[in-house]
Amino acid sequence: MNKAYSIIWSHSRQAWIVASELARGHGFVLAKNTLLVLAVVSTIGNAFAVNISGTVSSGGTVSSGETQIVYSGRGNSNATVNSGGTQIVNNGGKTTATTVNSSGSQNVGTSGATISTIVNSGGIQRVSSGGVASATNLSGGAQNIYNLGHASNTVIFSGGNQTIFSGGITDSTNISSGGQQRVSSGGVASNTTINSSGAQNILSEEGAISTHISSGGNQYISAGANATETIVNSGGFQRVNSGAVATGTVLSGGTQNVSSGGSAISTSVYNSGVQTVFAGATVTDTTVNSGGNQNISSGGIVSETTVNVSGTQNIYSGGSALSANIKGSQIVNSEGTAINTLVSDGGYQHIRNGGIASGTIVNQSGYVNISSGGYAESTIINSGGTLRVLSDGYARGTILNNSGRENVSNGGVSYNAMINTGGNQYIYSDGEATAAIVNTSGFQRINSGGTAPVQNSVVVTRTVSSAAKPFDAEVYSGGKQTVYLWRGIWYSNFLTAVWSMFPGTASGANVNLSGRLNAFAGNVVGTILNQEGRQYVYSGATATSTVGNNEGREYVLSGGITDGTVLNSGGLQAVSSGGKASATVINEGGAQFVYDGGQVTGTNIKNGGTIRVDSGASALNIALSSGGNLFTSTGATLPELTTMAALSVSQNHASNIVLENGGLLRVTSGGTATDTTVNSAGRLRIDDGGTINGTTTINADGIVAGTNIQNDGNFILNLAENYDFETELSGSGVLVKDNTGIMTYAGTLTQAQGVNVKNGGIIFDSAVVNADMAVNQNAYINISDQATINGSVNNNGSIVINNSIINGNITNDADLSFGTAKLLSATVNGSLVNNKNIILNPTKESAGNTLTVSNYTGTPGSVISLGGVLEGDNSLTDRLVVKGNTSGQSDIVYVNEDGSGGQTRDGINIISVEGNSDAEFSLKNRVVAGAYDYTLQKGNESGTDNKGWYLTSHLPTSDTRQYRPENGSYATNMALANSLFLMDLNERKQFRAMSDNTQPESASVWMKITGGISSGKLNDGQNKTTTNQFINQLGGDIYKFHAEQLGDFTLGIMGGYANAKGKTINYTSNKAARNTLDGYSVGVYGTWYQNGENATGLFAETWMQYNWFNASVKGDGLEEEKYNLNGLTASAGGGYNLNVHTWTSPEGITGEFWLQPHLQAVWMGVTPDTHQEDNGTVVQGAGKNNIQTKAGIRASWKVKSTLDKDTGRRFRPYIEANWIHNTHEFGVKMSDDSQLLSGSRNQGEIKTGIEGVITQNLSVNGGVAYQAGGHGSNAISGALGIKYSF
């Protein structure tokens, strides 16, 4: 029976699935090709039963439960699909004019195409997977476009709907009369036309492109969706919801509503079109053309709108427009805001009913009208622009540039306008302009009924008669103000930069920008002087309550009087001879100058204010606040200050003056200043012939100046930083240096009461000091090459001398040191008492300094530190030369400065004494150089000088040289590094249980642990060494080869760790040095047996190792010296194994007696790095490339006890004797001297021990060895070994 297949849409799979049932259909039925059907179904995801293929079918009805499938390049036309019926078009199938009725469906799949399908109410057309539907009519029916489906020219009406799913595409859809298009996420609709009662709902980010909305049509854009290049005609509507974006919309009479959270970009509004922006919406770059409107509601914000001619932007309560470009109209209504608007080319900005505009710029032919409570701030009117301030309008901070105009009338108010060159302000009837500033060539016109209560203008000429009282005015240079008569108010025209006032009263004048007010008589009240404005008060005139601001000046000339002037920052009052000023207040930055013959009374100088009172001037009852500045001289008269009653200047004497913040006191010739204090930025100037006494203190960054200063009191320098003091200082007083900085002095300093350095330091540079000096703790002085101190020095801090001369005694209770230069020579023409430290070697490279004193006394615990390049008698060294006597006791600390050491004969002179040599000097530290120790002795070896003190490299009262014990430590490390890892074949191979010559074991591992002690002597005859050592070596055979004719070959690897600690004692000086050595080795070895290792025959062995060590040497009183050694050692040797005798005991146990003559040669190539000790000695190894030869014989017995008769255990006791010869003796070369370990050239060695086989694979051994050579050299060691064979 033929089978048919119905198909059911699966929402979960988003595909058609097959259901089997009986089939009926029209056209060509291919029921028997069931397999083919299933194959097609499997490729396209659909099922079908009635197939149309290879022919064209016309007409036909697909009834309930039937499926018609159209495929394979043929088609069907005029089919009718009724309720429950399905038509499937795919795989090249094509249908035309299909009618799909209620509950019928047409499915267009891969490569299927339909044209002019009619889908009635309840019917559905599905287009997916490469299917194409063209010119479908949805008369109440539905069309769904799925992924890769495409529909074009669909017509939707009578409640029909089109849904575009992700990946679906539609083009040129026409929607009308209740039709609806829904663009789901991922779907795309382009060129859709929406007619009356049609609707498009957009939910896709890809959205709708080039939609055309006619009258009555609606487009709704939802969150996350986009609509691009939509055209909305008259009566059409576009709604942009929260999260949606509309870009490039054209409103050609239609409406766009942008809701909260919605965004519209680059909208164009034409004739009768309206864009409405609601709260929370964002709209940018809208263009409003002729007849178009942009309405901004409460909370809405738009930016960069362009309004062209006859277009309108309406800003309602709470709405805001930013950076609009207005060539049409902008209307700012109640509580609306416009910011940074540009108005030009016939554009109007209307600000009314409480609207606000800020930062508007008005260019050529632009207009701004402010009325009915409107407010505009910071408007800029450029050339050709106009601002009108009308009834109840208010403009603040308007800037009028060249040819810009502001009209104020009918109750309008302009405040603080700035009228620049060419700018114009017109004030008409009932208009008011307050606080305008009219700059150069600006113009302000006040017409009849206009008011300008506080006039900022550029006034040039003003004449005030005795009966007149002018308005307040600010006076600038070059401008013009014209005031016309209204209701009897006077008028005047100001044309010059001079305002002259004759008998009468003027008040409230403002004089600016080089303007000038001349008061020849009468009273001037309340003048304000700004920006280089000037007021001159002549004889007969009085100025009261003047205020001097930045660069404002008031000049009080002879006969002129001022009262109550206030001088602010930059303001100045100058009182000339015959002028008088009273009650002047000087604030921060203000200044009052009182010249010779001028008089001021009651001046109040605040913090930061300045008063200058010249010689011949007087300042009475002045009040100088803290931080106020006083400039005066001893020739002025300042009898007292109300705040400091003790301060006075009169009759060439100033007392208790405090100078700060620029304050100046000049002490003139013959004048005296007593108890002067100079604080930060204060200045004290002392002319030649002027004197300071009492306590003069210079603090912080205060300044004292003068070429010859006479100080008869306490002169205290307490400055904050380092400074130079380049003046002559004389007098009967004392100079006290009390700040932490450094003072550099060059000149002649004479102070009868001395110089006291309490803190910081003084550098005397080319100075002559005629005074006793005291250097306190934490203070210092540096006496340079060219400086001379004529006086005693008491040092509790630090003194640095160079090529200096001190003509006086020194008591040193701290540090007296040379500078860091080389070969310095200082002279003390007086006695030196040393209670602490004298340092002649401040660096490790300063050898050669000489200190010459008249007499020297040392107290117990005192130290003299010297240095030198230690070699022989002529070593370069620091020296103390005493022209007179020495007494007391001092320690000597001597430092070798990279000297290589050498043998001395007469000694190295470090202290020379010409008088009585009663002082005792002793070395406090150990002095070494090269291979030698140095000692200190009084007198030289030849006996020609029994007063001086000498360093010698021989033992006291003996010609024997003192060799350092470090020689032995270095030599021992050298020897050990080359010998610790030595071994021979017997120490490595171990005894085996096998006695035949079968194939040897395939591999083995072994370990040897050795401990021992060795001792020896150096060839200097003074130093003996003792060393303990520990060695752990392990290895293993990694390759074995056996050949009947060639013998047995073995290759192995080995490594080891060793450490040693030793001590060398010099038995002549009792000084000692300790050495340590630890390191590692890695190497390879090889052996050959002629007939196997347990048979009679020849054998040979060789090995090579790389060794590296860390070493140290620590001598008594010296720094620990650390260095490295590394290098190769290699060995070659051989011998003959001989079974001398074999026997069998009564118990049946076999024993053997063996002899083994052998020979071994070892090359030793481990060397140390060249090392320089802390004292400069260069250390190198001696005995490099030594070849050690060992020849000997070994006897052994293979035995087994009766207890072990039936086991594999066997033992081999042995004894061995060797002769050892070394081609070189190991040692050390320290600078140019070499010391060797004696007795190591030829040595004898005895070994004994036992080897045992525990199991077939495990063997152990133990033994002791003793070596002995000449000069008492010997070594004893014990070893344990273990070997495991595989």
Curated annotation (Swiss-Prot):
Signal peptide start and end residues: 1-49
Extracellular topological domain residue ranges: 1013-1029, 1059-1079, 1109-1126, 1165-1186, 1222-1242, 1268-1275
PROSITE patterns found in the cross-reference section: AUTOTRANSPORTER
InterPro entries named in the record: AC_1, AIDA, Autotransporte_beta, Autotransporte_beta_dom_sf, Autotransporter_Adhesin, Autotransporter_pectin_lyase_C, Bact_Autotransporter_VF, ESPR
Result, substituting D873A: No effect on autocleavage
Any one annotated GO CC term: extracellular region
GO terms under biological process: cell adhesion
Effect of E845A: Slight reduction in autocleavage
Periplasmic compartment residues: 1041-1047, 1088-1097, 1139-1152, 1199-1210, 1254-1259, 1285-1286
Domain notes: The signal peptide, cleaved at the inner membrane, guides the polyprotein to the periplasmic space. Then, insertion of the C-terminal translocator domain (or beta-domain) in the outer membrane forms a hydrophilic pore for the translocation of the passenger domain to the bacterial cell surface, with subsequent autocatalytic cleavage. Finally, the mature AIDA protein remains in contact with the cell surface via non-covalent interactions with the translocator pore.
Name of the protein this chain belongs to: Autotransporter adhesin AIDA-I
Source organism of the structure: Escherichia coli
